[in-house]
Swiss-Prot record:
One of its GO terms (cellular component) is ribosome. GO terms for biological process: translation. Part of the 50S ribosomal subunit. One of two assembly initiator proteins, it binds directly to the 5'-end of the 23S rRNA, where it nucleates assembly of the 50S subunit. GO terms for molecular function: rRNA binding; structural constituent of ribosome. The lineage of its organism: Bacteria, Pseudomonadati, Pseudomonadota, Gammaproteobacteria, Enterobacterales. InterPro entries: KOW, Rib_uL2_dom2, Ribosomal_uL24, Ribosomal_uL24_CS, Ribosomal_uL24_KOW, Translation_prot_SH3-like_sf. Pfam families: KOW, ribosomal_L24. Belongs to the universal ribosomal protein uL24 family. This is Large ribosomal subunit protein uL24. The keyword Iron does not apply. Keywords: Ribonucleoprotein, Ribosomal protein, RNA-binding, rRNA-binding. It comes from Citrobacter koseri (strain ATCC BAA-895 / CDC 4225-83 / SGSC4696). PROSITE patterns: RIBOSOMAL_L24.
Length: 104
């Protein structure tokens, strides 16, 4: 099955503490979750690793968010949108459902 959300897609958060925020997808995990730049920031308590010269402390990093809680952002309409699939020149491509514009 083809992925509706892929790396480097511009997405908008639909639910949760970061609702309404936009960001770029950094990574898509196989568990149905994605990591989005600047979204769902958590504080991680990190131990120092002297062998690698890494200091310890509290580090902020992006945590995974469920794919169902985000939607792809359509820059043409300025809103969240749904993704469809169709064949163009023998290739399967993604398109926005609202205006039928091909993605990338």
């Amino acid at each position: 099955m083809a992925a509706k959300i892929r790396r480097d897609d511009e997405v908008i958060v639909l639910t949760g503490k970061d609702k309404g925020k936009r960001g770029k997808v950094k990574n898509v995990l196989s568990s149905g979750k994605v990591i989005v730049e600047g979204i769902n920031l958590v504080k991680k308590h990190q131990k120092p690793v002297p062998a690698l010269n890494q200091p310890g402390g509290i580090v902020e990093k992006e945590a995974a968010i469920q794919v169902s809680n985000i939607a792809i952002f359509n820059a043409a309409t300025g809103k969240a949108d749904r993704v469809g699939f169709r064949f163009e020149d023998g290739k399967k491509v993604r398109f926005f459902k609202s205006n039928s514009e091909t993605i990338k």
